[in-house]
Every structure is written in C-alpha cells, then in structure tokens.
Amino acid sequence: GTEQHRHERESIVEGAVNRLTQLNLGDRSLVFGRIDPAGTGERFHIGRLGVWDRNQDPVVVDWRAPVAEPFYRATGREPMGIERRRHFATRGRTLLGIDDEVFGELASADGEREIKGQGALIAAIEASRTGRLGDIVATIQGEQDEIIRAPMPGVLLVQGGPGTGKTVVALHRAAYLLYTHRFPLE
C-alpha cells in the first residue's frame, strides 16, 4: 500500500496494543474490525465488548450494538451506509494482517470492481480444529447475523446439517438478546 496506509496500520497497531494492555483480555483480541460510514469521516472499531474514553465517547463498539450491524451485513449491492469494512487478523495480541473491503463511491474511486474482504473468513475456515467450539464473533456472516439479530418475540427455528454453525449462531443469539434486552429480562 501507500505510505499513508502503512502509517495508518502502525497507528492502529500501537493504539490497539496500548489499550489491550490496559484491558488484559488474555490471548483474545479486543478489536477485530472497523467500519467507516460513508461521507462522515467517522470510524467505528468493532470488538468483543464496548469501551469508552473518559468523555464516554466510544473507542470500541460492542459487536452486538446496532451501529455494528453493517460490519456483518453490508454487501456490494447493499453497503448499508458504509464505505469501508476492515477485518483485523490477530493471534493473541499480535496483528497478523488487515483485510479491507470498500463500497460505493470509494470502490469506484479506487478503481476496484472486485469485492474483497473474505480473507478473515477463509483464514478462520482453514485454521486447525481443536474439537472445541471456536470463537467466531469476528467472522459471523450476513445470513448468520440476520438470525442472531432477529426480533425477540416468537419461536426461531434454525435448521442445517452437521457443522453448519447452528450451535454457534444460537449462542451468539443468546448473547445478543441478553445485551439488547438486558433490562426487560432482569
């Protein structure tokens, strides 16, 4: 990439390492992605939990928050108001790589016609299996997110063959419902 892209990556890594040291998450990375809403100059870092600065401005947005929805569901045909989605590939506290997808006018301006950004998913699929349920919050796909964020009332039936992610989606749905409806459920 360009010198600006290299500087941006270095800045991201330095900030993430400093914050991770403060939060002590063990081997799990706090931040796994970022979305840039179109035309606003804003950036939202998406992570396992929400973190705010002293002024209560979000530093990391919880993956279950409504503002994080485009991270999982934006497509080339329906960018959901974002111009960039960025996946961070990490191992523990080490940033291994950054995978960008650009949408809308930004994609046209960069001359990019090809949809990119499947690197994080492919890496997760190719990772060795341990027999334990994996941590997939960074690689939830749009169809899975629709099930996870489905309205609460009524019965929700999730069907699929062995190994298609039914249990993982159900567990993330439970986490989403507890996050979104925590006060009515108390």
Model-based region annotation:
Residues 1-123:
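N-terminal accessory nucleic-acid engagement/regulatory domains that precede
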Residues 91, 124-186:
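P-loop NTPase Walker
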